[in-house]
Amino acid sequence: MRFLKSALPFVASALSLLSVQAAARSQEPSAIQHVSILEHAVINTPSHEVDHLTDFDVTFELPDKHQTIKLELEPNHDILADDAYVQYLDAEGNVHREEPIQRHEHKVFKGRSLLRRDNGLWRPVGWARVYVQRDGSKPLFEGVFSIDNDNHHVELKSTYLQKKRVEDASIPDRKDEYMVVYRDSDMIRQVRSELKRSLISSSSCQAEKLGFNSDPQHPIFRSEFQDMDLGMSSYGSMSLNSLFGLSKRQSDIGGVSGNAGGVNLAQTIGSTSGCPKTKQVALVGIAADCSFRASFDNDDAAKQWIINMVNSASDVYEKSFNISIGLRNLTMTDKTCPETAPASTQWNMPCDQSNITQRLNLFSQWRGQQSDDNAYWTLMSNCPTGSEVGLAWLGQLCNTEVTGDGSNSVSGTNVVVRVSGGGWQVFAHESGHTFGAVHDCDSMTCAQNLEASSQCCPYNRGTCDANGKYIMNPSTGADITAFSPCTIGNICSALGRNSVKSSCLSDNRNVVTYTGSQCGNGIVEAGEDCDCGGESSCGDNPCCDAKTCKFKSGAVCDDANDSCCSQCQFSPAGTVCRASLGECDLQETCTGNSSTCPADSFKKDGEKCGDTSGLTCASGQCTSRDYQCRTVMGSLIHDNNTYACPQFDSSCELICTSPSLGSCFSINQNFLDGTPCGSGGYCHNGRCDGSNFGSWVEQHKNLVIGVACGVGGLLVLSILWCMINRCRRARTVVKRPPMRPWPGPMPPPPPQMGQWAGPNRGYQGLRAEPPPPYPGPYQSATRYA
């Protein structure tokens, strides 16, 4: 007990935030200190007009910065799926109108930004994503571009004023519409440690309790430990939630969002192993609640803002993971919030009726009822909870179902609140959690040494604090334009291990997107042979014509897009296009007559593997319940003797123990799909499916034989004992006592003398005569006349 008491603080720090299904929150951006007016914008086409397929340049000035900027742009069709549609819900949550989203109505572009030097030449300085609202001689557009890693956010006057907070910079009051620009560096950088302490004190998140983990005598720890009533033996399961009062949800404000599944994140920094080698697309659904819709003048404005947000965020995913984000479904509610949330859309309610956590749970329940195969769903809202503006379930990419324990509903969902400054960054951040990313380490988590247990992503192997430079920083800040090398390794390794599913990602061929087939979007859609992403992206591609999206003469495939293509020809049969990652993962080879690598295939779940008894295949990995406990929990507490608690073998939640711990700990993470459970069942998304008694007998044959032999032996011994005892009784002569003579008829009853007053006492206290003796048991039967 002394060891357990001293070890519990460390165990808590290592395990309390280990849930792949934990929720992580985002903090509201800092105040905007300065805003510039964008002037003299010119679309450089003959008519100064563009359509959704135009490649063009736009130049403009930022007078107060003495800068002239050019954006070289081309259509970006990635974000809108061919079968994309928008449905409009009424106040009761019923669909009253549904229509496809027409690609030609949305002028969405991507490209690069350039800064004019004093000598008149242009210097490339970053990337750009733009949504053109109006072309002509006085164009209007919104989006983001970067200059030397400093994001510049372009918004219309009306958009800025809709989101403006009291602490944000004011802008001129003009009647006409115009464009403003503010930079990440224009947002006041507050001292993060002080900010977080002030926010934590008013937050419902329990992450602030992590402080007691370094001190076993901390009052919170001491009272929890001394007062808790386990109500079970030392082999019972102690949930860390009940043990320490910790929630399954971890706040971005607190600095911790979960765990990387037992992988040492320092070992995977910068590694793209596990991410797709050829471009893939994550098609998502987005729903907008009444508060979000009410923040716009009309449906079109809200729709355009969402498309622009996805357009901006997709850039960092393409660069980091070779995965673009596309919008397939858009659900819009009425701008008037219902007094009571309708049963069909319980997440659609006024801000004062729920917090962001409740909205995530309700939205997850709704998502589980949708019949689609989207990578995930995002709920757009205008209802922050205090300073919290984002919330996501960790590692739930491709999870279309909903599971939970009564208080939490888990699915592939997140919530994003419309904010002043960096709205697309919040969407990119929460989507990162959905892809399985934990937070970058900051001063608070480094002080707790959480990088050692991979509960945060260190800057590099020698430096812990990432200094707020990247997308997965717990709070928004200046110069955040990319994912950290550690996050890239975090997500890619999770995809490669199948601890985060990737089955919903679309191969870049015949993809159906919201915008319809468009040459130059980098997605090979119906009617196209290839699509290398437009002339600026294709470069000297020898296989694909960038203008027509058709193969060049003699080409039958595109090396840049097809796994079984070499020098524009099909790779020879037998060429390995997807190598095996282990005994349970089968390698795939090219057929010789196709450019597509066959679908990823694994050995059957439950098939024996490895040299150690008890190992079986699960989701393409050779593993076991004990092995997963060792790799997940054991790696954190540095105990190689960790194993799965046998009394919970029907559970698909990791419940582990070790001789040093003595008790079972529930760490709120599921076994891999395909892991054996119960009586012949297999885990699937946290549930044990297919368990039955017959399978249990087969699975535990040795135990059944042993028990049967033991019970059978007891039965044989019992029968022999009865036979021996019977024989002994048969040899014993029973001697009856001599028969008494017949005593004659019973005497007449005495005269009635009143009530009987008590034992052996008659009326008036006289002693009564006792009744005559009853004939003994061995007397002959007596006849009566």
UniProtKB/Swiss-Prot annotation:
Cofactor(s) demanded: Zn(2+)
Enzyme nomenclature, EC number: 3.4.24.-
Stretches assigned to the Cytoplasmic side: 725-785
Chain positions carrying an annotated carbohydrate: N322, N329, N355, N561, N593, N640
Region (Disordered): 737-785
Residues on Extracellular side: 27-703
Domain Disintegrin: 516-605
Membrane topology (UniProt): Single-pass type I membrane protein
Record field: transmembrane: 704-724
Binding-site positions, Zn(2+): H429, H433, H439
Enzyme class label: hydrolase
Active site residues according to the UniProt entry: E430
Name listed for the protein in its UniProt record: Disintegrin and metalloproteinase domain-containing protein B
Species, as recorded: Aspergillus fumigatus (strain ATCC MYA-4609 / CBS 101355 / FGSC A1100 / Af293) (Neosartorya fumigata)
GN (gene name): ADM-B
